[in-house]
Amino acid sequence: MFCCCKDCRGNQRVSNFDSLTGVFFGDLEFGPQNQRYIKMNEEEDKDQDRVTRGCSHTHSCNPPGPEDASHSHTCFHAHTHLIISDQQENDHSDSSNKKRLCGNREAVRKYREKKKARTAYLEDEVMRLQSLNEQFLRKLQSQEMVETELIRLRALLVEMQGKIEVELCSFSFQKQCNGSGFVFKEDGCNLATSNMMCEAARVECEEGQTLHDPIQSFVPQPPPFSR
């Protein structure tokens, strides 16, 4: 069976046709050109079926109240399916790709900025540590110089203490002999005197000397003070 009808545009459409070529229906011949036209109409029908589908069902309503209020009726529902054209799909995919690329670029830019800031922070930290290291080295060098100077001063102090002790002993001995005088006679020789500075005199006796003969004496001097 063949069904011929007109669509909303006034075009004649044929459905449920035989796939064989050269089939006649009355005065109409379905050749290759008509078959292409029929196939195009079938594709439009399929698109229309995909866009809008309808269904019906029957159900009973039992509202509260008297039994006469119960009834049954048939409902028709139309289900609409939106089909996006290829151009819209391409535009959507292009926009998605652009958004993805923009998002990737933004993420890369943020990562580079973060890495740059981290590098700058590490460089500043290295410079700070180098400065601290130089300060510690200078302190160590100054400490070594101080220790060397301390050793030198200690040695100088010990030397000064020794000199002071020598001077004090000499001064104490001179103080004990200050103002003393004596005459000592041994083997007919006179050991003479001590002056006010307690410089001991040693008299050398020779044979035949008397008290009236001149006396040769040797007066020792205190050790010189070394500076």
Curated annotation (Swiss-Prot):
Expression by tissue: Expressed in young leaves and cauline leaves.
Domain of life: Eukaryota
Residue ranges, annotated region (Leucine-zipper): 122-129
Ranges for region Basic motif: 98-118
GO cellular component: cytoplasm; nucleus
UniProt xrefs under CDD domains: bZIP
Reported induction: Induced by salt stress. Induced by osmotic stress.
Keyword Repressor belongs to the record: yes
GO biological process, one term: DNA-templated transcription
SMART domains per the UniProt record, alphabetical: BRLZ (SM00338)
Chain residue ranges for the region called Disordered: 44-68
One Pfam family linked to the record: bZIP_2
KW DNA-binding (keyword) present: yes
UniProt GO MF annotations: DNA binding; DNA-binding transcription factor activity; protein homodimerization activity
bZIP domain span: 94-160
Compartment list: Nucleus; Cytoplasm
Keywords, in A-Z order: Cytoplasm, DNA-binding, Nucleus, Repressor, Stress response, Transcription, Transcription regulation
Function, in words: Transcription factor involved in the regulation of salt stress response. Functions as a negative transcriptional regulator of salt stress acclimation response by regulating cation homeostasis. Negatively regulates the expression of genes contributing to ion and osmotic homeostasis during salt stress, such as the Na(+) transporter HKT1, the Na(+)/H(+) antiporter SOS1, the aquaporin PIP2-1 and the glutamine synthetase GLN1-3. In addition, targets genes with functions in plant growth and development, such as argonaute 4 (AGO4) and cyclophilin 19 (CYP19).
Extra remark: Plants silencing BZIP24 show enhanced tolerance to salt stress. Enhanced salt stress tolerance in silencing plants is characterized by enhanced root and leaves development and reduced sodium accumulation in plants.
Subunit note: Homodimer.
Name of the protein described by the UniProt record: Basic leucine zipper 24
Organism in which the protein naturally occurs: Arabidopsis thaliana
